[in-house]
């Protein structure tokens, strides 16, 4: 998400990305902060200084989204981010793992064979599901202290864009074949006090071997949960690639569907 925002929203400030100095060594946290906010001066009053630092930190979109533990002298701050992401779990039944050697283009010494520098292990096919929650209330109190609005609608829009495009857009040989497959986004009403369970274990992914060879994402158990709290739901969005994927089981719910490739409504 950070990498996508850094590349495609260059006007946004990001605190927790690697930066290098003139010697090509990574900057420290304090050096990175100083680079982002060169106008920041040490306030004589410790409380005022901490609030000034907090205001600066909240101008960074990654901190508004994910929070931070910021530890520099005189301004230790912990911000509980509105966005929480769990570890991905593979919900595809077949787990075919294979390994391959990585060879260097050079010999270790004159006359020797090409050097093997290691091996990499890959999964033939997997469909990793991540449960993501967004609770703006996590940051309300600390944003109020810093006279900041906290997480904005524009922040959420950029988050969703990154969640539907970030993996596909990432340039890396290790992720070849990895793409954003689907995003199910459920928004509760502003006054709702309900908390939805983790959807990860409620999803399964199979292959439609009889017809199209598409990957079929089954959401029947999620639909059962959402049907019980339908009065609390403001909207449901589903982003997926209809060329390669089918999503089933959300019948009975009002769902706005979008093509994850084009971004257009379907």
Feature map (PLM): residue ranges:
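RNA-binding basic/glycine-rich loop and surface signature characteristic of RAMP-family CRISPR effectors
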Residues: 2-266
